[in-house]
Design a protein with these regions (language model features):
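Glycine-rich phosphate-binding loops of nucleotide-dependent enzymes
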Residues: 1-140
Length: 140
């Protein structure tokens, strides 16, 4: 009732999402200790939890932090698939190359304040984005 899914259905859906993301082929149950998972598998579980309710906006704060190249690519592939499903992803990161590759729009913050916004078609390289960031933040 009231939109809640039964526990078995929740576990089934969580496992489907985790496998879809590609972080693990292990089946996870309600009693599975997260501590037994690798960093990438934990990240997969966290992302699966974030998309579980089919939210229109998914916030990923440093989702590739401490991941291998293979796991990072899985995050990128997943984000691209989410974007194709008409959901938005707020991708927060410090790696300018990751941010540039995955984003359509950029919002530059300085001390929590929005100081500049631009679309990907306004720039051609991550280095150009970095220069705009330096110039914008340096002006404040």
């Amino acid at each position: 009732p009231f939109g809640f899914i039964k526990e078995k259905e929740q576990i089934f859906e969580a496992n489907r999402l985790i496998r879809e993301i590609g972080f693990t082929s292990k089946l996870i149950n309600a009693e599975s200790p997260v501590g037994n998972l690798s960093g990438g598998e934990r990240q997969g579980v966290a992302i699966a939890r974030a998309i579980y309710n089919k939210a229109e906006l998914i916030v990923l704060d440093e989702p590739t932090n401490n991941l291998s190249l293979n796991e990072t690519q899985k995050v990128f592939d997943f984000v691209l698939n989410v974007k194709k499903s008409n959901r938005s992803v707020l991708f927060i990161g410090h790696n300018i190359y990751h941010v540039y590759d995955i984003s359509d729009r950029f919002v530059i913050l300085d001390r929590g304040e929005v100081v500049h916004q631009l679309n990907k078609n306004d720039i051609s390289t991550p280095e150009e984005l970095m220069k705009i960031m330096r110039d914008t933040i340096g002006a404040h």
